[in-house]
Structure formats: structure tokens, C-alpha cells
Regions:
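Intracellular coupling helices
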Residues: 6, 10-17, 21, 306-347, ...
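Hydrophobic alpha-helical transmembrane segments of multi-pass inner-membrane transport and secretion
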Residues: 18-45, 286-321, 349-354, 389, ...
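Alpha-helical transmembrane segments
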Residues: 32-60, 367
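Mid-to-C-terminal secondary-structure elements
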Residues: 93-99, 105-282
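Transmembrane alpha-helical interface segments in multi-pass membrane proteins
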Residues: 300, 321-367, 381-382, 386
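Hydrophobic alpha-helical transmembrane segments of polytopic membrane proteins
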Residues: 302-305, 379-401
Length: 414
């Protein structure tokens, strides 16, 4: 702090004490803005983190067709299997299709099949809750999952899900592939391949592979735990996932629908879209929330800036004679300008200090009501710097007008 600035502090404080109500109002306005802006920035960051969550699959190469046939209205397992295999064979022949698979669900798809997971058969409380993907034989390659350890399923490890259901107490799912998040939770610091867990059946399931990541269809706040069972699920209305080149997705999707309609006139298409579109729909509310918070931040900053401009302009008008006297006594325009900037800086600093305490209190309330995480400390200096800069920008106009007051004003006002 320069010597001139230090000398200005005492008269500034004296002036502010004579205008307690106005000073208090601007301090409270800055404090409230700081508190809301810090928490809003945090919530925007949280939403952006969710929206940018890694799915683990080849996002830009996949299209989804959710379809069924009127022939499947009989609820006959044999018919379901016949129709599903017929559709899958048709889709694999479509030009541009590199891989195709039938899946029961897909990341960010909304509907999720979940199951508790135990490490021992007699465990009372589950270790975790994981989403369950069923694989008819080509899920790993079609999704583009990255194997970190172990291997993919062998052909002799697959079974129809209807056979599993008919087996009753004797049902077994000998092997499974899990994602890294689940592996780290179940077996921290260990190699998960070869380890066993219990889920769906009374028999142990052995881990044969670990994929880097595989997101849940929903309930993202429940942990990113996912497992893949080698189960062929041929029920009506399943998802047919096609993998192609990013630039050919629309072309392949259109050709695939035409091929299916040619194969089966009784085709019923429930959904047809790219995975990017699936993802965009899932995070639509998060995106809307982020934009709403941006609008709130801009509105608050604008109102605060207008308040600072209005108050500073009022004070300049009231102190015209005082400014003229200081100019007559030798004060330069720069000194007058810095005087008002320092005055604003002091008000903003008090408001920001109160705002940080208020921001933390609001965050504690949100944590209790909506289970949000704790406000990271780095958002506080971000909000502080933003308000300091805003204050200096807002006061610059009135301060320049004050600096332009000529010394002669002092004599005319006498």
C-alpha cells in the first residue's frame, strides 16, 4: 500500500461512518452476492463434472435401436429368441456396422437393473450396489470397453437368462467382468481377477476381467459400480447397439431401420438415436440448471454493479466541494481517482469477508438438505476476485467524474 493510500484510509473510514446506512447496504449487497456466486459457481462446476462424466464406452461411434415385433406379444421365450437373433443377424449385415450387440441397458439410458453385491455368502449387509449389464456375446467389443486386466468371456461361458431363471436355487453365474470402480471397492489394493463375490445367485461368481470404466444408466450418485454377466437376454424391447464410424452414424441408423422393416413388417421401433443423443437427453436437466445458475450469477453481478455505481455517483455529487478543496490544495486527478477506488475496495473487502462466511453457511445448509458435497475452498477466492474486479470496474466511472472536478469548484461553492 502506498503512503498516499495509507493516508487516505482514515478520512475514508470517517466518511463511511457518516454514511452508515448506505455503507451497510452496499456491504450487505456485496456479501449476499459473494455468498450466492460462490455456491452457484460450485453447483455449476458440479453439474459440468456430471455432464462430462466418462461413460467408458465409444460414445461417438454408437447408435441405439430399441425394437420389438408384434410376433413377441405371445410372451414365448422361443419366439423372443428367434426374433432377437433374426434382428441381430440383419443388423450385422448393414453396411458400415463394425459390431452389434443386444443389451438390456446402456449408460445414461435412464432405466437401470441393479443388484446388491456381497463378498461372502452369509453377509448381512451388502458391500455395494452395482448395475448389471447382460452380454449376449459381443458387448465388450461393441461398447468399446477397455480391459485393464483379465479377459473377455469365452463362448462356452454364456447362458440364456431364461435358463438361469428356470434353474431356481441351482442357478449359477460362474464368471463376470466388473469395472475398475467396483474392483477397487471390493478388493482395495489387490488384483481383482480371480476373486469371487456373490450376487443374483447363492453361488460365487469369479471375476475374469476388469474394464477401465462403465457408467450406470442412472442413479449416478450411488457409486459408479458396474458388472457384466454372460447372459443372453432375448426379451422383447431390448436395445440393439451398433458400432460404426462417427461420421456414418446417421447413415447407418437409417439403413438399419430400413433393413429391419424389410426383414420384419411387424417391427415396432421404440427408440432410434445415437448415443450422443441418449447422453444429451439424460443430462438435459443438468444443462438447464447450469444455464439457470449462470443467469442468476450475471443478474446478481449486474445488480451489485448498478448499486455500486449509484452509491458512488451519489457520494461524488455530495462531495463535490470537498473534492474541489482537495484539488485546490494540490491533489492530482490520479489521487482523487485512487481515493474512490480505495474506498470501494475497503467496502468490497468487508462485504467479501462476510460473504465468505455466508457462503460456507449456505453450503452447510445445502449439504444437509440436498446431500451436496462440501464447498471447495478455491471457490471462495474466485468469488472474491470477481467481486473486487467488479467493484473497481463499477466505481471507475463515478471516480473519473470526481477526478475531473476542477479546483475552482471550491471557490464557487463558498
Amino acid at each position: 500500500m502506498t503512503g498516499t493510500a495509507a493516508m487516505d484510509i482514515r478520512p475514508i473510514l470517517s466518511t463511511l461512518m457518516r454514511h452508515k446506512i448506505a455503507s451497510l447496504l452496499i456491504v450487505l449487497e456485496i456479501a449476499l452476492t459473494c455468498a450466492i456466486v460462490c455456491n452457484a459457481l460450485f453447483l455449476i462446476g458440479d453439474r459440468l463434472d456430471r455432464m462430462n462424466m466418462h461413460s467408458g464406452i465409444a460414445d461417438h461411434e454408437l447408435v441405439r435401436i430399441q425394437a420389438a415385433s408384434l410376433r413377441q406379444l405371445s410372451s414365448d421365450d422361443a419366439v423372443d429368441k428367434s426374433v432377437s437373433l433374426e434382428y441381430l443377424d440383419t443388423l450385422r449385415k448393414v453396411p458400415g456396422v463394425r459390431q452389434a450387440a443386444i443389451v438390456s441397458q446402456l449408460p445414461f439410458g435412464g432405466s437401470s437393473n441393479n443388484s446388491s453385491v456381497n463378498l461372502t455368502s452369509d453377509q448381512e449387509r451388502p458391500t455395494l450396489d452395482a448395475t448389471v449389464y447382460t452380454d449376449e456375446g459381443s458387448l465388450v467389443k461393441t461398447f468399446g470397453l477397455k480391459l485393464l486386466a483379465g479377459r473377455d468371456f469365452n463362448s462356452d461361458e454364456f447362458q440364456d437368462i431364461t435358463d438361469l431363471q428356470k434353474a431356481g436355487d441351482k442357478a449359477q453365474i460362474p464368471v463376470a467382468i466388473i469395472n475398475r470402480s467396483m474392483a477397487e471397492k471390493l478388493y482395495p489394493g489387490q488384483n481383482a481377477v480371480g476373486k469371487v463375490f456373490y450376487s443374483w445367485t447363492e453361488s460365487p461368481t469369479r471375476v475374469i476381467g476388469v474394464v477401465e470404466e462403465l457408467a450406470r444408466p442412472n442413479s449416478l450418485d450411488q457409486g459408479a459400480y458396474a458388472m457384466i454377466f454372460p447372459l443372453r437376454d432375448y426379451g422383447a424391447g431390448k436395445h440393439y447397439i451398433l458400432r460404426t464410424e462417427p461420421g456414418r452414424r446417421a447413415e447407418v441408423l437409417d439403413a438399419a431401420i430400413k433393413a429391419l422393416k424389410k426383414t420384419d413388417p411387424n417391427l415396432l421401433v421404440v427408440n432410434q438415436d445415437t448415443f450422443d443423443e441418449v447422453r444429451a437427453r439424460y443430462f438435459e436437466q443438468d444443462r438447464a440448471m447450469a444455464w439457470m445458475l449462470v443467469v442468476v450469477i450475471v443478474a446478481l453481478l449486474l445488480v451489485t454493479a448498478l448499486g455500486i455505481v449509484g452509491l458512488a455517483s451519489f457520494w461524488v455529487q455530495q462531495r463535490t466541494k470537498q473534492i474541489g478543496v482537495r484539488r485546490a490544495l494540490g491533489a492530482t486527478r490520479g489521487q482523487i481517482l485512487r481515493y474512490f477506488q480505495l474506498e470501494n475496495f475497503l467496502l468490497a473487502t468487508v462485504g467479501i469477508a462476510l460473504g465468505m462466511l455466508l457462503a460456507y453457511s449456505i453450503n452447510q445448509l445445502l449439504m444437509g438438505k440436498y446431500e451436496l458435497p462440501r464447498l471447495p475452498l478455491h471457490y471462495l477466492p474466485i468469488g472474491a476476485i470477481a467481486l473486487w474486479l467488479l467493484g473497481q470496474a463499477a466505481v471507475f466511472g463515478p471516480a473519473r467524474r470526481a477526478a475531473a472536478v476542477p479546483p475552482a469548484v471550491a471557490t464557487r461553492s463558498v
